[in-house]
Curated annotation (Swiss-Prot):
Acetyl-CoA binds at V118, R125, F126, S276, R313, P553. The gene is glcB. Its EC number is 2.3.3.9. It comes from Mycolicibacterium gilvum (strain PYR-GCK). Pathway: Carbohydrate metabolism; glyoxylate cycle; (S)-malate from isocitrate: step 2/2. GO terms for biological process: glyoxylate catabolic process; glyoxylate cycle; tricarboxylic acid cycle. It is found in: Cytoplasm. Keywords: Cytoplasm, Glyoxylate bypass, Magnesium, Metal-binding, Oxidation, Transferase, Tricarboxylic acid cycle. It holds the Pfam family MS_C. The active site is at R341 (proton acceptor), D643 (proton donor). The keyword Metal-binding applies. Belongs to the malate synthase family. GlcB subfamily. This is Malate synthase G.
Length: 738
């Protein structure tokens, strides 16, 4: 790129430079020259530290590889392994007990347990939908998913099916019986609602009336006391809105005139710059930053076509109600509280390069760029200091003046400390008070898991979130022990002892370090986007395990998962778990090696085909369409939400089997060619899809998928980004894609 803007020792892409100066900086009172001078200084000071941390990863991995290669035949003793990891500094001393001191954190994080959406920032429509998913229709979520069965003529067709609707109403009434029970009887029996002397009164079939079992659950309403149009209830810190309109199509079929039950749903949302996006150059990054800016300024809008009509989707306003006394006004947030997930420490991006005597030098670490620019933009979502009004508009993000950044893929406490140093330097450049920028720690790398308490201590005054990520964590488990021997099959990983120990330890150490009431303790994604009945049955296990939040793939899933937090008082669970350590270091260090290679040839082929199909189905959309998060049908046509984490585990498992002779390179190539035809068929209805099977040698996507497996053992920590970014850039250049 020859037309870059020179800023000190940096050369900046003009599309980024213009965006920052003309769109992001106005309204922040930050002088452009001062800002860019600060960027230059941070890059100069912190890039060498970033590089040193990556070099340490490689050095530790080389030592571990060498140790395992010397023992791959005879095996090893657990104590010897532990001692070795301690000697090389992989295992660090656990710090003495402490409690985090994070302050200025919004209630959505500290005192509210509920679902968390993760959404790709490159898609403005998805981002708007997610931000607006703070409230969701339970009726719609039930009617449109398999939570309500099709039995007895209750199929969901092109027009409203009253039989299905009646099932939805009955389900919602049962939910209300559990979340906000009446003093006697059931919500199924009511024929109306009214407000009497500041309390809810439900009229019953027999003409009598009944109050709530706990009158304090009534917190607001719309309309008149004798004919409310909405009744607002609260349970376990979450709100339930009962909408009443006997003249509406649904309300007219309901003896109480209830037309919907609306649940407070996605309490928080992560706007993702990382695993769910394909951002490989300055143009991609600026699109992402611009969407983040629109969310923080409150002016992001997107034209949406639905049902033959086009409308503009914008961010929802806050919701107001009359308090039970009929006089006071109650205001509740209308939008999800937003985190932003930056990229990790590994990748660089050509949006900014070092000036090499007037030529383009090395690309600047992308994580440093993200920290600077997403934090700058985050200022637009903060309340002005000492002022009840907002600085740039009515749609706040944080009401306490914090910017929330999730930092992924950190390996150990030194990398967490580096992130905190970076955030501190960014605060200085932006003129923000220290610790304005909070950090969410993804516990998804093995060295972080094994040193989790030290990682939290390194961010004790910033941490607002720890979260397990089974897929990335398994990918790192495989890669770290790549030389130890062949691993078990992918599907068996979830039932291993180390996974259970990993999930338990995250909660236990979070509680031990004082996160309850100060920070989220989170758990992972439900990936089967169409199997909502299974999700409703199974995902309740996460709040029961002490997680104050867990990831969901859609607004609909957020509304359904919200029911679990009415059924489980997570903070009570945390009180019961406090003071326990349910896992041991030995369990966490148990490598998921196959104890004997007793797989039949058809089992091996099934595993290879499954993973090859998954890899191809995701990679082809990443490379050819620039889509980083896809609902990809698996080999059995079950739709799965795929991102780079799923790609990492699939490619690393096959790389491991290839390394140890379970499969051959020819097995991989043959399966990829066979599965390419399957993926082509699954995408046949997409007019923009480029088939792979007919000419795999000239399909960049196919070649990327093959490279991810065949060269998987050599990838840093098993990450897929280096190959994906290079291949996506290759595709964009070959296809003249901007």
């Amino acid at each position: 790129m020859t037309d870059r803007v020179t800023v000190g020792n940096l050369r900046v892409s003009p599309v980024l430079y213009d965006f920052i100066n003309n769109e992001a900086l106005p309204g922040t009172d930050i002088d452009p020259d001062t800002f860019w001078s600060g960027v230059d200084k941070i890059v100069a000071d912190l890039t060498p530290k970033n590089q040193d941390l990556l070099a340490r990863r490689d050095h530790l991995q080389a030592q571990i590889d060498k140790w395992h290669r010397a023992r791959v035949i005879g095996g090893f003793e657990a104590e010897d392994y532990k001692q070795f990891l301690t000697e090389i500094g992989y295992l660090e001393p656990e710090p003495a007990d402490f409690s985090v001191t994070t302050s200025g954190v919004d209630d959505e994080i500290t005192t509210t347990a509920g679902p968390q959406l993760v959404v790709p920032i490159l898609n403005a429509r998805f981002a708007l939908n997610a931000a607006n998913a703070r409230w969701g229709s339970l009726y719609d979520a039930l009617y449109g998913t398999d939570v309500i069965s099709d039995e007895d003529g209750a199929e969901a067709g092109s027009s409203y099916n009253k039989r299905r609707g009646d099932k939805v109403i009955a389900y919602a009434r049962r939910f209300l019986d559990g979340a906000a029970p009446l003093a006697s009887g059931s919500w199924t029996d009511i024929t109306g609602l009214r407000i009497d002397d500041g309390a809810v009164s439900a009229t019953l079939d027999d003409g009598g009336s009944v109050a709530l079992a706990d009158p304090q659950q009534f917190v607001g309403y719309h309309g008149e006391p004798d004919a409310p149009t909405a009744v607002l209830l609260a349970n376990n810190g979450l709100h339930i809105e009962i909408l009443i309109d006997a003249d509406s199509p649904i309300g007219s079929t309901d003896k109480a005139g209830i037309k919907d039950v609306v649940l407070e749903s996605a309490i928080t949302t992560i706007m993702d710059f990382e695993d769910s996006v394909a951002a490989v150059d300055a143009d991609d990054k600026v699109l992402a930053y611009r969407n983040w800016l629109g969310l923080n300024r409150g002016d992001l809008a997107e034209e949406v076509s639905k049902g033959g009509k086009t409308f503009t989707r914008v961010l929802n306003s806050d919701r107001t109600y009359r308090a039970p006394d009929g006089e006071t006004e109650l205001t509740l947030p209308g939008r999800s509280l937003l985190f932003v997930r930056n990229v990790g420490h590994l990748m660089t991006n050509d949006a900014i390069v070092v000036d090499d005597n007037g030529a383009d030098g090395a690309e600047v670490p992308e994580g440093i760029q993200d920290a600077l620019f997403t934090s700058l933009i985050g200022i637009h979502g903060l309340r002005s200091a000492g002022d009840d009004d907002t600085k740039n508009g009515p749609l706040l993000n944080s009401r306490t003046g914090s910017i929330y950044i999730v930092k992924p893929k950190m390996h150990g406490p030194d990398e967490v400390a580096f992130t905190c140093e970076l955030f501190s330097r960014v605060e200085d450049v932006l003129g923000l008070p220290q610790n304005t920028i909070k950090v969410g720690i993804m516990d998804e790398e093995r060295r972080t898991t094994l040193n989790l308490k030290a990682c939290i201590k390194a961010a004790a005054d910033r941490v607002v979130f720890i979260n397990t990520g089974f897929l990335d964590r398994t990918g790192d488990e495989i890669h770290t022990s790549m030389e130890a021997g062949p691993m078990i099959r992918k599907g068996a990983m979830k039932s291993t002892d180390w996974i259970a120990a990993y999930e338990n330890q995250n909660v236990d150490i979070g509680l031990e370090t004082g996160l309850s009431g100060k920070a989220q303790i989170g758990k992972g994604m439900w990936a089967m986007t169409d199997l909502m009945a299974d999700m409703v049955e199974q995902k309740i296990g996460q709040p029961k395990a002490g997680a104050t939040t867990a990831w969901v793939p859609s607004p609909t899933a957020a509304t359904l998962h919200a029911m679990h937090y009415h059924q489980v008082d997570v903070f009570a669970v945390q009180s019961e778990l406090a003071g326990k350590r349910r896992s041991t270091l030995d369990q966490l260090l148990t490598i998921p090696l196959a104890t004997e290679l007793a797989w039949a040839p058809e089992e091996i082929r099934e595993e290879v085909d499954n993973n090859c199909q998954s890899i191809l189905g995701y990679v082809v959309r990443w490379i050819d369409a620039g889509v980083g998060c896809s609902k990809v049908p698996d080999i059995h046509d079950v739709a799965l939400m795929e991102d780079r984490a799923t790609l990492r585990i699939s490619s690393q498992l096959l790389a491991n089997w290839l390394r140890h002779g379970v499969i051959t390179e020819e097995d991989v190539k043959t399966s990829l060619r066979r599965m390419a035809a399957v993926v082509d068929e699954q995408n046949a209805a997409d007019p923009d899809f480029r088939p792979m099977a007919s000419d795999p040698d000239n399909s960049i996507a196919f070649q990327a998928a093959q490279e991810l497996i065949l060269d998987g053992a050599a990838q840093p920590s098993g990450y897929t980004e280096p190959i994906l970014h290079r291949r996506r850039r290759e595709y964009k250049a070959a296809s003249n894609v901007g």
